[in-house]
Amino acid sequence: GAYQISPGLDTYVDGTGWGASSWGSGTFGSSSAIGSNNQLRLWSMDSFGEDLIACPRGGSIYYWDYTNASTRAIALADLAGANLAPTLGLQVLISDVDRHVVILGADPINATASGRTGAIDPLLVAFSDQENAAEWEPLSTNTAGSLRCSAGSQIIGGLRARQETLIWTDVALYSLQFIGAPLTFGLTLINEGISLIGPNAPVNTPTGIFWMDKKGFYAYQGSVQPIPCSVHSYVFDDLNEGQAFQVFGFLNKQFNEVGWFYCSGSS
């Protein structure tokens, strides 16, 4: 049947080869590329005023206009007045100060500054001009720009917190903070040697940020602290690490607790 956006998969794919893609595709013994269409589909989205910006992990970035509620979302790069807007990303969110659109793992501007490369830079953090989702060209007359995480090989996820945005790579935790002109944002390494088990694993609560890594639970209240856990072995000895990106953290306000849904070893 016809569709506008590929639905993706409901399981995470570690590698490709036998059993990947459609029957008969590729030659015997060859691998196939993992794209957003044949990978676990994880959407991120955030409100930009009354509008919505959304992005399937590793896919295109979309903008939905609330005032035209009967129309479909369009690609961010097709937005009226769009200038060098990213075409791909791992996650989208809005900054806590000044309403900048932030794309984690955006495709960078090409060498001639005539467009985007169309290839994700997994450590790049790109941000738009203040309160302007269409303007992404870094100029002295605006506040658009980009920063790159130095530790790790890819950004796992990010979460807006109080006066900062936390960004996890596969080996480190960073803090993205608004610092004003001329740099707009500063990216500070908080802790190296920890990570995030999946993009939806962090939880924002009134008392701090909590998240699950592949070997433990952590809290952040200005510094990183491990959380003692009486069921640590029960959870991590029976964790399906191959489906780590399906982990989902949640806040239960009624009982003042946080928790995580995860795939067990037999699932």
For each feature predicted by the language model, list its residue ranges:
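Small/polar beta-strand repeat architecture
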Residues: G1-L42, A69-I74, D78-L84
